[in-house]
């Protein structure tokens, strides 16, 4: 490998005009396999993030023109890019979460299509795997895993008794892990 001191700096405080953030906030640039876009997530101790998007090629070249996606006030807690689609997990006016979709090339949260409406369960996180999009759902304290299908309908994936689920971004599959619990 190369010397890390020669790596380009893609984001830091004061590097890009218009993208200011507090000392407590940290930038994270996320890329998704097969997407031509990169997502910049600014986060702190809140579950919500402030997000921007830019073409991946421009980002890697160090000349990204970041387009705003959402602010902290929009209460977006998770996001993935699937091809040309940007999926956002939104809690604003939906405390149990809802999943919306907008264009990655020209995101408009206000006009995003609702993919999964708020329901009786809590949408905790989303992840993209090779075979689709997965939702981690909390149902009365029990974790559930659902693979998103056409028109927002999903297929529940049975987890072994005592299993929780982890949703690593970009994995080939969503992997369950067994929690340490006492069984009666």
Question: Where in this protein do the model-derived segments appear?
Answer:
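Peripheral, non-catalytic segments that deliver or gate enzyme domains
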Residues: 1-184
């Amino acid at each position: 490998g190369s010397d890390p001191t020669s790596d380009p700096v893609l984001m830091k405080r004061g590097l890009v005009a218009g993208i200011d953030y507090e000392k407590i906030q940290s930038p994270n640039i996320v890329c998704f396999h097969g997407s031509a876009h990169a997502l910049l997530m600014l986060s702190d101790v809140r579950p919500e993030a402030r997000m921007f998007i830019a073409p991946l090629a421009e980002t890697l070249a160090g000349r990204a023109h970041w387009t705003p996606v959402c602010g902290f006030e929009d209460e977006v807690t998770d996001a993935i890019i699937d091809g040309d689609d940007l999926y956002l997990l939104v809690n604003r006016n939906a405390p149990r979460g809802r999943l919306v979709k907008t264009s990655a090339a020209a995101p408009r949260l206000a006009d995003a299509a609702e993919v999964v409406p708020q329901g009786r369960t809590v949408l905790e996180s989303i992840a993209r795997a090779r075979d689709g999009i997965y939702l981690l759902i909390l149902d009365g304290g029990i974790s559930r895993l659902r693979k998103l299908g056409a028109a927002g309908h999903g297929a529940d994936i049975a987890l072994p008794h005592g299993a929780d689920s982890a949703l690593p971004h970009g994995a080939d599959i969503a992997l369950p892990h067994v929690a340490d619990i006492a069984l009666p």
